[in-house]
From Swiss-Prot:
Family: Belongs to the V-ATPase D subunit family.
Key words of the record: ATP synthesis, Hydrogen ion transport, Ion transport, Transport
InterPro entries given in the database record: V_ATPase_D (IPR002699)
Underlying gene: atpD
UniProt-recorded name of the protein: V-type ATP synthase subunit D
GO biological process per UniProt: proton motive force-driven plasma membrane ATP synthesis
UniProt-listed Pfam families: ATP-synt_D
UniProt KW Ion transport keyword: yes
The keyword Ion transport appears for this protein: yes
Function: Produces ATP from ADP in the presence of a proton gradient across the membrane.
PANTHER family: V-TYPE ATP SYNTHASE SUBUNIT D (PTHR11671)
MF annotations from Gene Ontology: ATP binding; proton-transporting ATP synthase activity, rotational mechanism; proton-transporting ATPase activity, rotational mechanism
Length: 208
């Protein structure tokens, strides 16, 4: 490791020791941050996998039920049932700070005013069968899970990026900056000791 190109003076030695102390403290803080991010990241990956499996399973089941329910209806009538959607939702995003990483928090709110005017679904109960009503309701209930999945996946992506950045900073301090400072400090201490010995020898020669 190449040492820093500085003059071997006591002032430089003091400055370098302060820099080393700061770098060592920063290294510990960054390692702690990386470890905590990794712990949360693993938890989120687990949640992501469980959510995805649940959603895919429920969507597949709902689609199967919907196809069966649709089979008993006239195709033109089914198209008319969904021609005018009335289910409206408001989506907004907040930002949450997790270990200095800004991640999204999705919120959804149903706008029930129009639904109350025209009925719960975009079609009439009188025109559809109960199986179709049931599958549509189940699909609506999946909305929050889908938003949570999107939230978790985006959070995982942002955390992964920050973990990589933090890892590079930790490695930079651990394998480059701190060793370089330590080697330079050692070099200056040796030079100062040599200068002190040389000065002592000169004094002894003068007094002898």
């Amino acid at each position: 490791m190449a040492r820093l190109n500085v003059k071997p003076t006591r002032m430089e030695l003091s400055n370098l020791k302060n820099r080393l102390k700061t770098a060592t403290r920063g290294h510990k803080l960054l390692k702690d941050k990386r470890d905590e991010l990794m712990r949360r990241f693993v938890d989120l990956i687990r949640e992501n996998n469980e959510l995805r499996q649940t959603i895919e399973k429920e969507l597949a089941a709902n689609m199967k039920e919907f196809v069966l329910a649709k089979a008993s209806e006239n195709s033109l009538m089914v198209e008319e049932l969904f021609a005018v959607p009335v289910h409206e939702v408001t989506l907004w995003i907040d930002i949450e700070n997790i270990m200095s990483v800004n991640v999204p928090k999705f919120h959804v709110q149903s706008n029930t005013a129009r639904e109350q005017e025209q009925g719960e679904f975009a079609y009439s109960y009188l025109s559809s069968n109960s199986e179709m009503d049931n599958t549509i309701q189940k699909t609506k209930e999946l909305l929050e899970k889908l938003l949570r999945l999107a939230e978790v996946e985006k959070t995982c992506q942002l955390m992964a990026d920050d973990i990589e950045k933090t890892r590079r900073r930790v490695n930079g301090l651990e394998y480059a900056i701190i060793p370089q400072l330590e080697e330079t400090i050692h070099y200056i201490e040796l030079k100062l000791e040599e200068a002190e010995r040389a000065s002592l020898v000169r004094i002894m020669k003068i007094t002898s």
